[in-house]
Amino acid sequence: MEFLKHYEDDEDQDDENNTKDENVNKINKRQHFEIENVIDEIPDLPLSFFENFKKIKHYSSEIIDETNKKTRLFEHVEGNYPTFIYFKVPTKSRNDIKELIEQVKEIGNEINIKQDTETCFHISISRTFPIREHHIETFTQELKKTLKNQRSIDIQLSKECCVFINDNQSRIFLSIPINQSFKSNILKLIERIDSCLSLFKFPKYYDNPEPHLSISWSLITNNNNETNDENINYIPLNKFKNKEIIRDNLKLTDSFKVSRIFWNIGKTESFIDLQ
């Protein structure tokens, strides 16, 4: 009987061990499945995150940079870096483009849009969006992969001078759009970049895109009251419409080749050469 008792105890112990092994296997399989799902997803930046950016103009939480009175689209958060993609417009080696820019600046002085943009003139081919630090390397690799076989394109500025208003209606820009005959080249490039951005759930470029070279800008005020700040010029909100043509007889410049695409992540500039 004692022998049978030991036998039954051993058998129970084996059953218990088998049950534990099965449970462990189930847990391992479940964990493996969950890990695979996590790898397949890009977390941290849901679409609702960017929907909030679109609504930012309705809140008093807009961030004012007191250095230059610019309104940021989103608040600075440690670990987030403002990012955008663009190509540069040659000005140092192109007198015709420099003369065109000076002509637009004179128009800006006439209509009070006269705050100079940065000295490095460029055309953006993405929105500005925040990227998390741990996504930077993956995003950079994917963007390079997307543009790896992209050929250089020819671009020509148009004869029109237009105004563009930013998303949160805080600034107005005096700009030169792309000549319509060359527009399809850049739109195809934007489509490729959008395909990369969508993988990370970053916002795509604007609907009905109108890529442009911004020359000067002004802050927008919601009323007609003059500001006490003599160093900053303001434009009433309803004075101009977005994409309104101010002048359509600018001197036509020659085309130029875009053979390098840049992107800024925070203060770091990177680029890739096109074929």
Swiss-Prot record:
AMP binds at residues 122-124, 206, 208-214. Coiled coil: none annotated. InterPro entries: Usb1. This is U6 snRNA phosphodiesterase 1. One of its GO terms (biological process) is U6 snRNA 3'-end processing. Belongs to the 2H phosphoesterase superfamily. USB1 family. It comes from Dictyostelium discoideum. Residues 1-25 are annotated as: Disordered. GO terms for cellular component: nucleus. It catalyses: a 3'-end uridylyl-uridine-RNA = a 3'-end 2',3'-cyclophospho-uridine-RNA + uridine. It comes from the Eukaryota. It is found in: Nucleus. The lineage of its organism: Eukaryota, Amoebozoa, Evosea, Eumycetozoa, Dictyostelia. It is an enzyme of class 4 (lyase). Its main location: nucleus. UMP binds at residues 206, 210-214. The active site is at 122 (proton acceptor), 212 (proton donor). 3'-5' RNA exonuclease that trims the 3' end of oligo(U) tracts of the pre-U6 small nuclear RNA (snRNA) molecule, leading to the formation of a mature U6 snRNA 3' end-terminated with a 2',3'-cyclic phosphate. Participates in the U6 snRNA 3' end processing that prevents U6 snRNA degradation.
